[in-house]
Amino acid sequence: MSSPGDTAVLVLAAGPGTRMRSDTPKVLHPLGGRSMLSHLLHAIAKVAPQHLAVVLGHDHERIAPLIADWADDLGRPIDVALQERPRGTGDAVRCGLSALPDDYAGVLVVTSGDTPLLDADTVADLIAGHTATRAAVTVLTTTLSDPSGYGRILRTQDNEVTAIVEHADATESQREIREVNAGVYAFDTAALRSALNRLSADNAQQELYLTDVIAILRGDGLPIRARHVDDSALVAGVNNRVQLAQLGAELNRRIVAAHQLAGVTVVDPATTWIDVDVTIGRDTVIHPGTQLLGRTQIGGHCVVGPDTTLTDVSVGDGASVVRTHGTGSSVGAGATVGPFAYLRPGTVLGDDGKLGAFVETKNATIGTGTKVPHLTYVGDADIGEHSNIGASSVFVNYDGESKRRTTVGSHVRTGSDTMFVAPVTVGDGAYTGAGTVVREDVPPGALAVSAGPQRNIEGWVRRKRPGSAAARAAEAAEKAAGGRPAGEAE
């Protein structure tokens, strides 16, 4: 039998996933910020098996490079085996054994790649229970209110597992059974190898079922064990997008609850979505309609939302981000962002800074205490500390061929509707007048004004727009003031 301490895990991910109706391989469909397969591999890596391999078939050329990336992230090898033709789960396991050493004789855990909520504790418990009983196989089971599509667990009157019958091959009475195969097993590898050689495709699907191994091993007189998982979501599989959405919602519910128990206020969990790799500090408040995605990091005592989506954004302690869409950006401690701000990749807002209503930023560094209050585009720019950018200003960064940068110093005050035509530098302490087009560098402490003196052409409306509402209003105003219509001869 198996030697304690020797563990290998085989993940079956060769199926085409036709019920997903998708060009994307089933195991690559995301939920909670990772693909289904990535979730599973991260969980298994925590168990630290000696060997970990994934069996691929359909779209293996798309999945294998991602597995290599995940292996690097996890700091451990993950082998790949190929099932050339889809001949069932039994054949997939036989192909997977080729990724293990020929003399491997320890515990072999087999699981499907579409069980994204399977966690390390459940796998570790399976291995421990299997090793303690020295069984030939231990299968995880769960009980479902609607077991349609799942293999049923057959037991004797003494409650011993005798076989697993697939739904397509089950009789009407067997389909009434609610205890189902969770698709996760721990095998004695030597016993498994022997049973695989005796599998038959004499079934409704004309495939080699891994589940048939149970009856074969029982026929050999070997001990069969089952471990029931009360939390069925942990072993639930995904075959279509309805199930994907259901498991995604369940995963999100667990993620949100974990943050709440850690000291985060989530006002409306039903409309708040948080990816698994997101971190949030204590006493932060998350308002309804907020999505925190990717590797977003939120500090403590922050206010985020409502109606905010942040992807790979870092937010410092005490910051406020309201009705904002941000990606690949950093918001400093005590800063305020929004409402209706758009932070594009490369945005860095310093501590106590402000990006107000209808401000868009991209590839821009905005210093400590600097304010961009409203209606402004800041792209490819570096702004110093404690400056103020007037409303409706634009950093004109594109000349039709390439992007160019603008540098604005510290303690700068710019008037509304200033255009910075890059490349240009505005020195520390400089000012610009309203409506200025900055085409040349502005020295420190200077006032830049590009507009000429205002010229009023009196009587223009009466002459050019006679009879218009504007002309009538102007005439009435002039008469009320006791004056003669502008431009009329005495």
UniProtKB/Swiss-Prot annotation:
Official protein name in the record:
Bifunctional protein GlmU
Please list the GO biological process terms of this entry. Answer: cell morphogenesis; cell wall organization; lipid A biosynthetic process; peptidoglycan biosynthetic process; regulation of cell shape; UDP-N-acetylglucosamine biosynthetic process
Residue stretches of biased makeup (Low complexity): 467-490
Task: Give the matching PANTHER family.
Answer: BIFUNCTIONAL PROTEIN GLMU, NUCLEOTIDYL TRANSFERASE
Predominantly, its location class is cytoplasm
Look up the EC number in the record and give it.
Answer: 2.7.7.23, 2.3.1.157
Originating organism: Mycolicibacterium paratuberculosis (strain ATCC BAA-968 / K-10) (Mycobacterium paratuberculosis)
Region span, N-acetyltransferase = 263-490
Q: Which gene encodes it?
A: glmU
Is Metal-binding found in the keyword set? yes
Q: What does this protein do?
A: Catalyzes the last two sequential reactions in the de novo biosynthetic pathway for UDP-N-acetylglucosamine (UDP-GlcNAc). The C-terminal domain catalyzes the transfer of acetyl group from acetyl coenzyme A to glucosamine-1-phosphate (GlcN-1-P) to produce N-acetylglucosamine-1-phosphate (GlcNAc-1-P), which is converted into UDP-GlcNAc by the transfer of uridine 5-monophosphate (from uridine 5-triphosphate), a reaction catalyzed by the N-terminal domain.
Recite the UniProt keywords alphabetically. Acyltransferase, Cell shape, Cell wall biogenesis/degradation, Cytoplasm, Magnesium, Metal-binding, Multifunctional enzyme, Nucleotidyltransferase, Peptidoglycan synthesis, Repeat, Transferase
Reactions the enzyme catalyzes: alpha-D-glucosamine 1-phosphate + acetyl-CoA = N-acetyl-alpha-D-glucosamine 1-phosphate + CoA + H(+); N-acetyl-alpha-D-glucosamine 1-phosphate + UTP + H(+) = UDP-N-acetyl-alpha-D-glucosamine + diphosphate
Q: Where is this region: Pyrophosphorylase?
A: 1-241
Query: Which cofactor is essential here?
Result: Mg(2+)
